[in-house]
Amino acid sequence: SVTFNAIVVTLVEHGVTPSALAARLTYAGAPEALQAAVAAGLCGLGTVFVGSTEGAAKMLYEAIPFGEKPTRPLADMAKDIVADHRARKLIVPGLGHPLHKPIDPRTPRLFQIAAENGLSSHYVALMQAVQEEAERVSGKSLPINATGAIGAIAAEFGFPWKIIRGFGVMARAIGLVGHILEEIDDPMAIEIWQRVEKEAGGPRQD
């Protein structure tokens, strides 16, 4: 579908992240095994990179199980969600971005595509309510980031939260192949290794 394609395209590339570096460094050591380099990069996808999609979806499903309708105003549910995360000293998944403030420009476009294709109901609305409550309580700019938007839209699809990270794995595999192609044409892995060896490795012992 158009919406699913938009999700995948959004997740393909995220710059020179730890997973991209892992892929590049592995390829530098084993250029005959492209698949190993991609696999090394994919192992770095977790709760910090890509994994907040599943965290956001899980949070929304816990508030409104799939197939059910909200039993309370979404604003009240959002207050409970934010209060629970603050009490447990947890970050609300899907909110905040180090660069994109006050809005992650990918989010409104994803929500627009979802709405145009009939995939914008109470999960998207609850995610937006959670953002408003989190900003109100913290006094900080906490935009819904792309992975938060994707988590909400994936919940609208009805995908089980446990497999939603898989969409990021699938998409990022494409991006890592692109990084390896770039590594072939314009290498950086060996330079990174040598700089780390020089700057953090200490005196060499022969």
Residues covered by each model-derived region:
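Non-transmembrane, aqueous-exposed alpha-helical and coiled segments at domain scale
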Residues: S1-D206
